[in-house]
Swiss-Prot record:
Main location: cytoplasm
Keyword field: Cytoplasm, Glycolysis, Lyase, Magnesium, Metal-binding, Secreted
Tree of life domain: Bacteria
Binding residues annotated for Mg(2+), in chain numbering: D242, E285, D312
UniProt keyword Transport, yes or no: no
Biological processes annotated in GO: glycolytic process
Family note: Belongs to the enolase family.
Co-factor binding details: Binds a second Mg(2+) ion via substrate during catalysis.
Gene Ontology cellular component terms for the protein in this record: cell surface; extracellular region; phosphopyruvate hydratase complex
Protein name: Enolase
Transmembrane segments: none
Required cofactor(s): Mg(2+)
Length: 427
């Protein structure tokens, strides 16, 4: 009854107006799963490869007709008739069919779309929500949201070199309360920026992109907004950064074009340590560049005992790179992006490896998103305890938050909001 009888691929648009892949998987009993694949702006060099057509006369070369063709053609030919409940077998069959180490032949966008749609179809066939189907009976932890309320770097056209400044409502008693907290801070910040004469346009992920000279200046605005919204920074709400340092790492130096400063790896580590001493920052993502292993080690040794150091470009949701990082003792957390690795099976393996090594895991969106809310279910399924899915504006971001509200309501008194326990540094 759960045999795959049809796979339909199509080209749709993401939140930046670029094409992406959507997949429908239909089972013998009529159940159907649909998944849309996200896309990143700041991509790690070691990520799985999304297949683009390269035809400059169509979507500027960003079309995905080849990936869609692979979905309905080669991939369906290989896994049609297989049992959708055999997720590992199906994902492994697609990996073998592609035959490359980075899924570049068929495209990680094609493979991931099918992988997630298979899981959703199987969940529907079993009459179970996706988080329960993937995570089992223990899936009941609602994640702390990392809400990106100030955008910089490649996500915005402003001088702020860091890509994201986020608020984390760790003191809330429920996810719904955490979401309200974030929304109130977001609207307060908008008023504060407007009052100071700054624009309140939003970036790719729904956060504000004010023309501020430095991360310090942006952090000061956020701290003020937290207080004026009626919350206590460092108690109710903690701060998090995504430096996306690979984007401004040039010739062994960290070049802050907005600040007109250049820092060595040691100076970069000390600068981040200084920020954590002056602001209630409990999580820093990609504080060092993806291949600056010495820098990562220095940063981890300096503040890894008290701050969550998240590897995004460093680990790219890849168990091989994560295992190497664990062995080296660099970072203490992994950012989990399903499209960085390209299958649900490999994503779950990365989370499992992280948890076994006492690393935290943060489920994450991409800057180019869709209305698909699968990662909300996966955050609960994996008991990650943290989710990073943008600001409190743009429906491509709020779709994930709204799905988490539904899950919390469905779980009722079984729901457990992760709160401070999500972060080793606060536990």
């Amino acid at each position: 009854m759960t045999a795959i009888v049809d796979i339909i691929g199509r080209e749709i648009l993401d939140s930046r107006g670029n094409p992406t892949v959507e997949v429908d998987v239909v089972l013998e009993d009529g159940s159907m799963g649909r998944a849309a694949v996200p896309s990143g702006a700041s991509t790690g060099a070691h990520e799985a490869v999304e297949l683009r057509d390269g035809d400059k006369g169509r979507y500027g070369g960003k079309g995905v007709e080849k990936a869609v063709e692979a979905v309905s053609g080669e991939i369906f030919d290989a896994i049609g008739g297989m049992d959708a409940e055999n997720q590992v077998q199906i994902d492994n069959a697609m990996i073998a069919l592609d035959g490359t180490p980075n899924k570049s032949r068929l495209g990680a966008n094609a493979i991931l779309g099918v992988s997630l749609a298979v899981a959703k179809a199987a969940a529907e066939s079993c009459d179970m929500p996706l988080y329960r189907y993937v995570g089992g009976t223990s899936a009941r932890v609602l994640p702390v949201p990392m809400m990106n309320i100030v955008n910089g770097g490649v996500h915005a056209d402003n001088p702020i070199d860091f890509q994201e400044i986020m608020v984390m409502p760790v003191g809330a008693q429920s996810f719904a309360e955490a979401l309200r907290c974030g929304a109130e801070i977001f609207h307060t910040l908008k008023g504060e920026l407007k009052k100071a004469g700054h624009n309140t346009n939003v970036g790719d992920e729904g956060g504000f992109a004010p023309n501020l000279p430095s991360a310090d200046a942006a952090l000061d605005f956020v701290m003020s907004a937290i207080g004026k919204a009626g919350y206590k920074a460092g108690d109710d709400v903690m701060l998090a950064l995504d430096c996306a340092s690979t984007e401004f790492f040039k010739d062994g130096k960290y070049v802050y074009e907005g600040e007109k400063k250049t820092r060595s790896r040691s100076e970069q580590a000390k600068y981040l340590a200084d920020l954590t001493s002056r602001y209630p920052i409990v999580s820093i993502e990609d504080g060092m560049a993806e291949d600056d292993m010495d820098g990562w080690k220095e940063l981890t040794d300096l503040i890894g005992g008290k701050v969550q150091l998240v590897g995004d470009d460093l680990f790219v949701t890849n168990v091989t790179r994560l295992a190497d990082g664990i062995k080296r003792g660099i970072g203490n957390s992994i950012l989990v992006k399903v499209n960085q690795i390209g299958t649900l099976t490999e994503t779950l393996a990365a989370v499992e490896m992280a948890h076994k090594a006492a690393y935290t895991a943060v489920m994450s969106h991409r800057s180019g998103e869709t209305e698909d809310s699968t990662i909300a279910d996966l955050a609960v399924a994996t008991n990650c305890g943290q989710i990073k899915t943008g600001s409190l504006a743009r429906s491509d971001r709020t779709s994930k938050y709204n799905q988490l509200l539904r899950i919390e309501q469905q779980l009722d008194d079984q729901a457990l909001y992760a709160g401070r326990s999500a972060l080793k540094a606060l536990a």
